[in-house]
Protein backbone atom coordinates (compact mmCIF):
# COMPACT_ATOMS: atom_id res chain seq x y z
CA UNK A 1 0.00 0.00 0.00
CA UNK A 2 1.38 3.41 -0.90
CA UNK A 3 0.72 6.72 0.78
CA UNK A 4 1.67 10.27 -0.04
CA UNK A 5 3.94 12.17 2.35
CA UNK A 6 4.54 15.65 1.03
CA UNK A 7 5.60 15.23 -2.58
CA UNK A 8 7.00 11.70 -2.29
CA UNK A 9 5.24 8.35 -2.39
CA UNK A 10 5.73 6.08 0.60
CA UNK A 11 5.66 2.32 0.15
CA UNK A 12 4.61 0.71 3.45
CA UNK A 13 6.18 -2.64 2.53
CA UNK A 14 9.73 -1.27 2.81
CA UNK A 15 9.17 -0.13 6.40
CA UNK A 16 9.82 -2.23 9.49
CA UNK A 17 7.85 -1.78 12.69
CA UNK A 18 8.84 -2.32 16.31
CA UNK A 19 6.41 -2.31 19.24
CA UNK A 20 8.18 -0.26 21.93
CA UNK A 21 5.57 -0.51 24.67
CA UNK A 22 2.14 -2.02 25.34
CA UNK A 23 0.26 -0.64 28.32
CA UNK A 24 -2.90 -1.82 30.03
CA UNK A 25 -5.42 0.60 31.50
CA UNK A 26 -8.08 -0.61 33.93
CA UNK A 27 -11.45 1.03 34.49
CA UNK A 28 -13.42 -0.26 37.45
CA UNK A 29 -17.16 -0.41 36.75
CA UNK A 30 -20.13 -1.87 38.59
CA UNK A 31 -19.76 -5.27 36.89
CA UNK A 32 -16.00 -5.57 37.44
CA UNK A 33 -12.96 -4.31 35.59
CA UNK A 34 -12.78 -3.14 31.97
CA UNK A 35 -9.36 -3.36 30.30
CA UNK A 36 -8.11 -1.22 27.43
CA UNK A 37 -4.68 -1.27 25.83
CA UNK A 38 -2.36 1.29 24.33
CA UNK A 39 0.61 0.57 22.08
CA UNK A 40 3.65 2.68 21.19
CA UNK A 41 5.12 1.69 17.82
CA UNK A 42 8.14 2.92 15.83
CA UNK A 43 8.34 2.44 12.04
CA UNK A 44 11.34 3.06 9.80
CA UNK A 45 12.90 2.16 6.47
CA UNK A 46 16.55 2.16 7.69
CA UNK A 47 17.23 4.90 5.15
CA UNK A 48 16.50 8.09 7.10
CA UNK A 49 12.70 7.90 7.38
CA UNK A 50 11.31 7.05 10.80
CA UNK A 51 8.05 7.69 12.66
CA UNK A 52 6.28 6.81 15.89
CA UNK A 53 2.64 6.44 16.80
CA UNK A 54 0.35 5.72 19.73
CA UNK A 55 -2.75 3.57 19.37
CA UNK A 56 -5.49 2.76 21.87
CA UNK A 57 -8.10 -0.01 21.67
CA UNK A 58 -9.91 -2.75 23.59
CA UNK A 59 -7.58 -5.41 22.13
CA UNK A 60 -3.78 -5.35 21.74
CA UNK A 61 -3.64 -6.13 17.95
CA UNK A 62 -6.12 -3.32 17.24
CA UNK A 63 -4.05 -0.90 19.34
CA UNK A 64 -0.89 -1.89 17.45
CA UNK A 65 -2.62 -1.42 14.07
CA UNK A 66 -3.82 2.05 15.10
CA UNK A 67 -0.32 2.91 16.35
CA UNK A 68 1.26 1.86 13.03
CA UNK A 69 -1.25 4.02 11.11
CA UNK A 70 -0.44 6.94 13.43
CA UNK A 71 3.31 6.37 12.96
CA UNK A 72 3.00 6.74 9.18
CA UNK A 73 1.32 10.12 9.76
CA UNK A 74 4.28 11.29 11.89
CA UNK A 75 7.24 10.39 9.67
CA UNK A 76 10.39 12.53 9.88
CA UNK A 77 13.54 12.54 7.77
CA UNK A 78 16.76 12.03 9.76
CA UNK A 79 19.98 13.57 8.43
CA UNK A 80 22.65 10.85 8.48
CA UNK A 81 26.33 11.68 7.88
CA UNK A 82 28.05 8.46 6.82
CA UNK A 83 26.97 5.93 9.43
CA UNK A 84 26.30 8.38 12.26
CA UNK A 85 24.75 11.79 13.00
CA UNK A 86 26.39 15.12 12.16
CA UNK A 87 26.78 16.58 15.67
CA UNK A 88 26.00 16.23 19.39
CA UNK A 89 22.45 17.10 20.39
CA UNK A 90 20.55 17.15 23.65
CA UNK A 91 16.78 17.50 23.89
CA UNK A 92 14.23 17.55 26.69
CA UNK A 93 10.59 16.48 26.49
CA UNK A 94 8.62 16.73 29.74
CA UNK A 95 10.82 15.04 32.40
CA UNK A 96 12.89 13.01 29.91
CA UNK A 97 16.20 14.20 28.51
CA UNK A 98 18.07 12.49 25.70
CA UNK A 99 21.70 12.98 24.71
CA UNK A 100 22.83 11.85 21.23
CA UNK A 101 26.50 11.83 20.20
CA UNK A 102 28.10 10.82 16.90
CA UNK A 103 30.39 7.78 17.13
CA UNK A 104 33.28 6.60 14.98
CA UNK A 105 32.67 3.85 12.44
CA UNK A 106 32.51 0.39 13.98
CA UNK A 107 31.22 1.56 17.37
CA UNK A 108 27.69 0.33 16.78
CA UNK A 109 24.45 1.51 18.36
CA UNK A 110 25.00 2.16 22.04
CA UNK A 111 21.47 2.94 23.16
CA UNK A 112 19.06 1.55 25.67
CA UNK A 113 15.36 1.17 26.20
CA UNK A 114 13.10 3.05 23.83
CA UNK A 115 15.92 4.85 22.01
CA UNK A 116 17.53 1.80 20.36
CA UNK A 117 14.70 0.85 17.95
CA UNK A 118 14.40 4.48 16.79
CA UNK A 119 18.05 4.93 15.83
CA UNK A 120 18.24 1.43 14.28
CA UNK A 121 15.11 1.95 12.16
CA UNK A 122 16.38 5.39 11.11
CA UNK A 123 19.43 3.70 9.60
CA UNK A 124 22.03 5.08 12.02
CA UNK A 125 24.73 2.44 12.52
CA UNK A 126 27.12 4.23 14.92
CA UNK A 127 25.83 6.41 17.76
CA UNK A 128 26.18 6.96 21.50
CA UNK A 129 23.02 7.83 23.43
CA UNK A 130 22.17 8.52 27.04
CA UNK A 131 18.68 8.79 28.46
CA UNK A 132 18.45 11.04 31.52
CA UNK A 133 15.57 11.80 33.86
CA UNK A 134 12.28 10.01 33.38
CA UNK A 135 12.34 6.71 31.48
CA UNK A 136 8.66 6.87 30.50
CA UNK A 137 8.72 5.21 27.04
CA UNK A 138 6.46 7.79 25.36
CA UNK A 139 8.48 10.75 26.66
CA UNK A 140 11.83 9.14 25.74
CA UNK A 141 10.61 8.32 22.21
CA UNK A 142 9.22 11.85 21.77
CA UNK A 143 12.46 13.44 23.02
CA UNK A 144 14.54 11.24 20.69
CA UNK A 145 12.38 12.14 17.68
CA UNK A 146 12.55 15.85 18.44
CA UNK A 147 16.35 15.60 18.78
CA UNK A 148 16.76 13.67 15.51
CA UNK A 149 14.51 16.15 13.69
CA UNK A 150 16.69 19.08 14.87
CA UNK A 151 19.95 17.63 13.48
CA UNK A 152 21.36 19.75 10.68
CA UNK A 153 23.79 18.54 8.02
UniProtKB/Swiss-Prot annotation:
Transmembrane segments: none
Pfam families noted in UniProt: Ribosomal_S5, Ribosomal_S5_C
Residue ranges constituting the S5 DRBM domain according to the UniProt record: 15-78
UniProt superkingdom: Bacteria
Domain remarks in the Swiss-Prot or TrEMBL record: The N-terminal domain interacts with the head of the 30S subunit; the C-terminal domain interacts with the body and contacts protein S4. The interaction surface between S4 and S5 is involved in control of translational fidelity.
Family: Belongs to the universal ribosomal protein uS5 family.
Record-given protein name: Small ribosomal subunit protein uS5
Species whose genome carries this gene: Helicobacter acinonychis (strain Sheeba)
Gene: rpsE
Amino acid sequence: MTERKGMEEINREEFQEVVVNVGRVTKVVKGGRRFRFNALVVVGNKNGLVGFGLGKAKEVPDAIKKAVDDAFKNLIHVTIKGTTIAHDIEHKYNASRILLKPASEGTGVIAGGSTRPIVELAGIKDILTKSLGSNNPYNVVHATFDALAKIKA
